[in-house]
UniProtKB/Swiss-Prot annotation:
The lineage of its organism: Eukaryota, Viridiplantae, Streptophyta, Embryophyta, Tracheophyta. Belongs to the cyclic nucleotide-gated cation channel (TC 1.A.1.5) family. Residues 1-117, 173-207, 261-280, 428-733 are cytoplasmic. The keyword Endoplasmic reticulum does not apply. One of its GO terms (cellular component) is plasma membrane. This is Putative cyclic nucleotide-gated ion channel 9. Residues 139-151, 229-239, 302-406 are extracellular. Residues 629-644 are annotated as: Calmodulin-binding. Pfam families: cNMP_binding, Ion_trans. It comes from Arabidopsis thaliana (Mouse-ear cress). Homotetramer or heterotetramer. One of its GO terms (molecular function) is calcium channel activity.
Length: 733
């Protein structure tokens, strides 16, 4: 009768258990099926067994019935798909985006924004609810307690708007996936997208709390007072609002904490900045002051009403309790009560008498004597009560002088305990958030103190101490205590490459050696560069020391000096600026495929004339780049390297000087030979003798001078030509 095909299920053994997985129809076409096929495989078979002699009339009469039944079966099939039948119950977060189900990822940006707005709405709801406690007030001219209609309408409207957003959040919870607890073995886990399971989980956890929080009971009470009782049921309205607001506060506060925890779990942090976190806890403290002030106002009015009720019940006059509430002017005996109420209530319940008053109002006397319970100015009433709550929460109620009334004493005890807990919570969390702003500075101070103690213990000379202090100060100003290299190394490779490219590419292109290289080679170089800082008068490298890194100057000026290994009489000095580099001996070593592990020696001494920022490429990294990228072996790089290398520039200058001196010597010898040839043609003996003596003197002087120049030329030629890098590969680009 029921002909349903089996669903395609994939089984796999995981942790010794046979797990079943069902794919979404929209994810893989191999498991998808058309609507007609689905209807044929999962519909009621009304044809029955086929008989050869079936009558045609029976087929015609049952055709309409079968057609209607198929339509109904098709409708049931669509309903089954809409409620989640035949859809996988757990998927990964990235698969949820392509799913046909309208289910939200708990870490979706839209949902995170809604959660933050919902936390804000909860705080606003907790702030709006105390406004209902300000509705009752005392009418001095009529000596009765009434309800502020204007404030009631405003509070009801605000509460309704906030509850509407609360209802939207509740509806959103039925469409929010959750991570299956069994899938949290590794990674983020799988998301459960089955609407039935999502609804079941929400109903078992926070639905009851949310439902009790969103019940519009205060709105109903106020609406009943304004439009049904016509303002005649002040006592019932006051009692109902007091009970409802205080009772609904419990689920609202209970819901606020897990919602904040859930926001931290999904977003990673609750507040993006330290100031936002500190402001959040300060706001909660002010909110507590607002609640305490509203409760104090209501209890003060209740205490005042208690005094009136006591006078009314003890009076020999005809006094009914309802006479104390406005709206009961039509009751029997009210006219007689109006003639004596002022004198009776003022005599037995004075609020301005300090010497032996007939009724002790205790901590509520200030509210009654200030006149806020009878004021219709909500702004002055609200801020006065807010200040009272903030003052007594901060002082833990130390200035309160209570009466013997038990309710008043209990309220004072609760106020002191709440003030102690909230003040500790505020100070602790604000200290935590604000310390995070200066934690780097404190770490720097501790390191500087340890450095000073160490230098004092090791008895370092003053000049070394000053250099250490200058370096620490310069490094702090440049990095603010952040270990940039370690921070970048902890990121994924592609993200690390993009960050290095953003930070270093423009600076590396300013180095002429790398100006015309391709992008892949520049990416490889940028990924391996490390920032370096040097203070004034510090040595980057000394002549004769092994060169373990090649430095590319980004900012600052350096002095590069060479003495050709300490040879007397030889000194060469040049300046390095932004875009230059030093340690070029390492490039020759890296390009040589036969170079061993011994690092080359530096031919120059580099000293910082100002604060210097540079990028360093260590020997192993340069060797790797040179071996992987043949672009470094091009002729263009060869010419650029020779042009900007200080070692090659020095050799070229010395070579040119030696060649020029050889040329000058040759010209002088040629001139001397011509003079000798001209002198041989003279026949006068006196003139010949004179010329012979002059020639002998000049010859001696020339020989002596030539010897000195030849020796100087030999000394210049002694400066060896720098090693030629292996530029065997031609530039093919």
């Amino acid at each position: 009768m029921l002909d349903c095909g089996k669903k395609a299920v994939k089984s796999q053994v995981i942790s010794g258990r046979l797990e079943k997985f069902v794919r979404l129809d929209s994810m893989d076409s191999r498991y998808s099926q058309t609507s007609d096929t689905g209807l044929n495989r999962c519909t009621l078979n009304l044809q029955g067994p086929t008989r050869g002699g079936g009558a045609q009339g029976n087929n015609v009469s049952s055709g309409s019935f079968k057609k209607g039944f198929r339509k109904g079966s098709k409708g049931l099939w669509s309903i089954g798909r809409s409620i989640g039948l035949g859809v996988s119950r757990a998927v990964f977060p990235e698969d949820l985006k392509v799913s046909e189900k309208k289910i939200f990822d708990p870490q979706d940006k839209f949902l995170l924004l809604c959660n933050k707005l919902f936390v804000t709405s909860c705080i606003l709801a907790v702030s709006v609810d105390p406004l209902f406690l300000y509705l009752p007030f005392v009418k001095d001219n009529e000596k009765c307690i009434g309800i502020d209609r204007k404030l009631a309408i405003i509070a009801t409207t605000l509460r309704t708007v906030i509850d509407a957003f609360y209802l939207f959040h509740m509806a959103l919870r039925f469409r929010t996936a959750f991570v299956a607890p069994s899938s949290r073995v590794f990674g983020r886990g799988e998301l459960v997208i089955d609407p039935a399971q999502i609804a079941k989980r929400y109903l078992q956890q926070y639905f009851i709390i949310d439902f009790l929080s969103v019940l519009p009971l205060p709105q109903i009470v106020v609406w009943r007072f304004l439009y049904i009782s016509k303002g005649a049921s002040v006592l019932a309205t006051k009692r109902a609002l007091r009970s409802i607001i205080l009772v609904q506060y419990i689920p609202r506060f209970i819901r606020l904490y897990p919602l904040s925890s859930e926001l931290k779990r999904t977003a990673g942090v609750f507040a993006e900045t330290a100031w936002a976190g500190a402001a959040y806890y300060l706001l909660l403290y002010m909110l507590a002051s607002h609640i305490v002030g509203a409760i104090w106002y209501l209890l003060a009015l209740e205490r005042y009403n208690g005094c009136w009720t006591k006078v009314c019940s003890n009076s020999s006059l005809d006094c009914h309790r309802n006479f104390l509430f406005c709206g009961n002017e039509k009751m029997d005996g009210y006219a007689a009560w109006t003639t004596i109420k002022d004198s009776v209530l003022q005599l037995n319940c004075p609020v301005n008498t300090t010497d032996n008053p007939p009724f002790d109002f205790g901590i509520y006397l200030r509210a009654l004597s200030s006149g806020i319970v009878s004021s219709k100015s909500f702004v002055s009433k609200y801020f006065f009560c807010l200040w009272w709550g903030l003052q007594n929460l901060s002082t833990l109620g130390q200035g309160l002088e209570t009466s013997t009334y038990p309710g008043e004493v209990i309220f004072s005890i609760a106020l002191a305990i709440a003030g102690l807990l909230l003040f500790a919570l505020l100070i602790g969390n604000m200290q935590t958030y604000l310390q995070s702003l200066t934690i780097r500075l404190e770490e720097m101070r501790v390191k500087r103190r340890d450095s000073e103690q160490w230098m004092h213990h090791r008895m370092l000379p003053p000049e070394l101490r000053e250099r250490v202090r200058r370096y620490d100060q310069y490094k702090w100003l440049e990095t603010r205590g952040v270990d940039e290299e370690n921070l970048v190394q902890n990121l994924p490779k592609d993200l690390r490459r993009d960050i290095k490219r953003h930070l270093c590419l423009a600076l590396v292109r300013r180095v002429p050696l790398f100006e015309n290289m391709d992008e892949r080679l520049l990416d490889a170089i940028c990924e391996r560069l490390k920032p370096c800082l040097y203070t004034e008068s510090s040595y980057l490298v000394r002549e004769g020391d092994p060169v373990n890194e090649m430095l590319f100057i980004i900012r600052g000026r350096l002095e590069s000096v060479t003495t050709d290994g300490g040879r007397s009489g030889f000194f060469n000095r040049s300046l390095l600026k932004e875009g230059d580099f030093c340690g070029e001996e390492l490039l020759t070593w890296a390009l040589d495929p036969k170079s061993g592990s011994n690092l080359p020696s530096s031919t120059r001494t580099a000293k910082a004339l100002t604060e210097v920022e540079a990028f360093a490429l260590i020997a192993d990294e340069l060797k790797f780049v040179a071996s992987q990228f043949r672009r470094l072996h091009s002729r263009q790089v060869q010419h650029t390297f020779r042009f900007y290398s200080q070692q090659w520039r020095t050799w070229a200058a010395i070579f040119i000087q030696a060649a020029w001196r050889r040329y000058v010597k040759k010209k002088k010898l040629e001139q001397l030979r011509k003079e000798e040839e001209e002198g041989e043609g003279s026949v006068t003996s006196i003139r010949a003798t004179f010329l012979a003596s002059k020639f002998a003197a000049n010859a001696l002087r020339k020989v002596h001078k030539n010897r000195i120049e030849a020796k100087s030329t030999i000394e210049l030629v002694k400066y060896q030509k720098p090693s030629e890098p292996d530029f065997s590969a031609d530039d093919t680009s």
